[in-house]
Amino acid sequence: MRRLVLLAPAVALLAGCGATTVTGTAAPSPPSASTNSSNAGGLPPDPQPGATEDCPYLGSEVVAEANGQHVSKVRVSADQPHPACFFYRPDGKVQLTVRVYVGDAKTATALVNQAAPLDSSNPASDPSGWKGGYLSTGDGAVYAVAKGSAAVIASTNQKQSVKARTVVKKAISALKL
């Protein structure tokens, strides 16, 4: 009984020190990585898929041919003047994302360096005059380039960065950037 009396205040003190999970309830989820890292250094937040509609600068056929997968759905972000486009596979998973940024040169370069960090990516200079990087990731590949105040970044679920590069070049051409 004496142990119980001494143990009760210790338990009460420890209970106030951390999160509590009660059996049979959902555990609290940690903050998402996009919340913490997407706005690092004052960069615009990562785009989020919104309305289901055609991408205004890339057709589904172009993406299907470049990425080698059928496109079942396209969603676009609310970003303006150029929304990010999310292309989905038939199983409902994103196969390719294209983000276009037009603003100031420092932010454009920072977005490219965030997507394809200088120290871990291969240099990219295609199309002519654009600079950035490409790399394979655990989920596929990224190709990201900037020129002046514009940046175009493509992420694919395919390991070959040439697929993302092809889409970036098509987007740049369609938008006349």
Enumerate the language-model features and the residues they cover.
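Bacterial signal peptide processing site
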Residues: 17-21
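Extracytoplasmic low-complexity, Pro/Thr/Ser/Ala/Gly-rich segments
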Residues: 25-91, 172
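Amphipathic alpha-helical interface surfaces
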Residues: 59, 107-108, 167
